A protein has these predicted regions:
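FIC/Doc superfamily catalytic core
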Residues: 1-130
């Protein structure tokens, strides 16, 4: 992106446009350094959080970060994380994301993604048992 963006209702302010290319380069350096060290669920959640924090696009950052997260999960044999769209689930998601972005408290976000992957796995098991 070439303009500064703000996220409505969020405390996090994305980096200035001139910083985005370097931030994106750093993101993929981090990915290459950690892809074989972290559990795939943790890796996918970290990439989601890091990409949406950089906010490299004017629009579609959340969708793109969820696609990237789910690609990493699928590449590693896990089901996609289905993030529910109801009000309570969205508030939990935004709260956990904001803690990661503004306080560097990543555990709530990692747990949220892990719980969603687990729920998807349980649904698949329940369907296959029927």
């Amino acid at each position: 992106r070439t303009v500064q963006v703000m996220i409505s209702g969020a405390k996090h302010i994305p980096p200035q446009p001139y910083l985005v290319p370097k931030e994106m380069e750093n993101l993929f350096i981090w990915y290459n350094e950690n892809k074989d060290k972290l559990h795939p669920v943790e890796l996918s959640a970290e990439m989601h959080e890091r990409l949406v924090t950089i906010h490299p696009f004017i629009d579609g950052n959340g969708r793109t970060s969820r696609l990237l997260m789910n690609l990493i999960l699928l590449q590693n044999g896990f089901p996609i994380a289905i993030l529910k769209g109801d009000t309570e689930s969205r508030l939990k998601y935004y709260s956990a994301l904001e803690s990661a972005q503004t306080e560097n408290k990543k555990q709530p976000f990692l747990q949220l993604i892990g719980d969603n992957v687990k729920e998807t796995m349980e649904r698949i098991i329940n369907i296959s048992e029927k």
